């Protein structure tokens, strides 16, 4: 795959990657990175943003992976935060490949059927994506409290705060939930998973998240989420200059 670490002001564009037992595109401990117009399929993770800041993931096709697009904090790394990521205008479809990651790796815990997953990431905007056919769930936002290693890293905040979900087209998600999601849905007297799921930690310390058009989605766990106001300019938007390749952010 493509695995930049400790990068600054980078661009990953126009690649086709498949059959990788980790992430096809991995952005680790980096700042101001654009991931644009790539195709990733038949991998464990399509695109993974780990412990990175000011990242734009735009115009990609993530299909037939275990998980399509991930924004993570992994414990024990020199950079302890992951914030200000924009995930927009991507096609995230049919990410139902059985997980074939190396046992013990963090991505080995990704449920098959995951569209977009945010774990412990802050200030993540998920907007204007088409998210369809992901059997466990379209968007899952969770706390690292559910992962022992994240919860035990005292320098990492395990909570996903200030997540914004705006104006995504979502349908045909949650048809065959995997693992714990299936048990959760059964506890709610349902066999179908959600378009959007937010797991709160036991301490309920997650703060400041919002969603637009919530009535359009099948969702669970968004009771504490606010309705989003009009969008604001984010730091990652300021990275582009007028010379960027034919796009205006």
Task: Mark where each language-model region is.
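Loop/turn-rich, solvent-exposed surfaces of beta-rich toroidal or solenoidal domains
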Residues: 114, 120-121
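Right-handed parallel beta-helix
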Residues: 8-23, 31-45, 53-67, 81-96, ...
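N-terminal secretory signal peptides
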Residues: 105-106, 198
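Acidic, glycine- and Ser/Thr-rich low-complexity intrinsically disordered tracts
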Residues: 147, 151-249
């Amino acid at each position: 795959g493509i695995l930049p670490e400790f990068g600054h002001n980078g661009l990953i564009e126009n690649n086709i990657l498949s059959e990788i037992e980790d992430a096809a595109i991995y952005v680790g401990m980096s700042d101001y990175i654009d991931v644009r117009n790539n195709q990733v399929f038949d991998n464990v993770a399509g695109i993974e943003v780990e412990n990175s800041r000011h990242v734009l993931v735009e115009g990609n096709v993530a299909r037939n992976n275990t998980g399509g697009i991930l924004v993570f904090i992994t414990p024990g790394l020199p950079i302890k935060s992951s914030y200000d990521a924009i995930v927009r205008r991507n096609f995230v479809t049919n990410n139902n490949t059985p997980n074939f990651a190396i046992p013990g790796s963090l991505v080995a815990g990704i449920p098959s059927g995951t569209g977009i997953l945010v774990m412990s990431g802050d200030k993540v905007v998920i907007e204007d994506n088409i998210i369809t056919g992901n059997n466990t769930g379209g968007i899952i936002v969770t706390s690292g409290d559910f992962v022992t290693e994240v919860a035990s890293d005292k320098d990492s905040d395990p909570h996903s705060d200030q997540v914004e979900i705006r104006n995504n087209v979502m349908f045909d998600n949650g048809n065959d939930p995997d693992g714990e999601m299936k048990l959760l849905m059964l506890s709610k007297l349902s066999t179908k998973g959600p378009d959007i799921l937010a797991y709160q930690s036991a301490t309920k310390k997650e703060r400041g998240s919002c969603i637009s058009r919530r009535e359009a989605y099948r969702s669970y766990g968004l009771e504490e989420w606010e309705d989003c106001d009009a969008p604001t300019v984010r730091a990652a938007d300021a990275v582009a200059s007028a010379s960027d390749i034919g796009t205006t952010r």
